[in-house]
Amino acid sequence: MRDSLLVFCGAGLGGLLRHGLNQVSLRLALFGFPWMTCFINISGSLAMGLLVGYLAGHGDSRFPQSLRLFLATGVLGGYTTFSTFSLENALLIERGAVGLAVLYSLVSVGLGLGGLFLGLTLTRSLS
């Protein structure tokens, strides 16, 4: 239960950070490109890489599981799930499963877009 509460609180903070950045981006819209979403995805991936890289070098003793859950699953998960997607792809590539990483990327993006358009189509047809 404690771990779930830590993830919940972290996700709230990550979501608030994302929302704040999106509010700033409303004033910085250039050429109709989603710059802030792009920045959030890249910065979240960078933060995940820094966190995982640090953990790999320092182990459990200096970084308890509860703090990992709060930061990685909670804060970064609330900020952007793209950081987890990037980490999972990097782990596949590091294990030599490049083909599986490409497949995961294509399936995730392709079916994600497909699911979104299906949802839009269904709700529009019901309106």
From Swiss-Prot:
Gene that encodes it: fluC
Identification of the protein by name: Fluoride-specific ion channel FluC
Species in which this protein is naturally found: Beijerinckia indica subsp. indica (strain ATCC 9039 / DSM 1715 / NCIMB 8712)
Record's function text: Fluoride-specific ion channel. Important for reducing fluoride concentration in the cell, thus reducing its toxicity.
Positions bound to Na(+): 77, 80
Phylogenetic classification of the source organism: Bacteria, Pseudomonadati, Pseudomonadota, Alphaproteobacteria, Hyphomicrobiales
Transmembrane segments: 28-48, 73-93, 98-118
Family: Belongs to the fluoride channel Fluc/FEX (TC 1.A.43) family.
GO molecular function terms listed in the Swiss-Prot or TrEMBL record: fluoride channel activity; metal ion binding
Broad class of the protein's primary localization: membrane
Keywords: Cell inner membrane, Cell membrane, Ion channel, Ion transport, Membrane, Metal-binding, Sodium, Transmembrane, Transmembrane helix, Transport
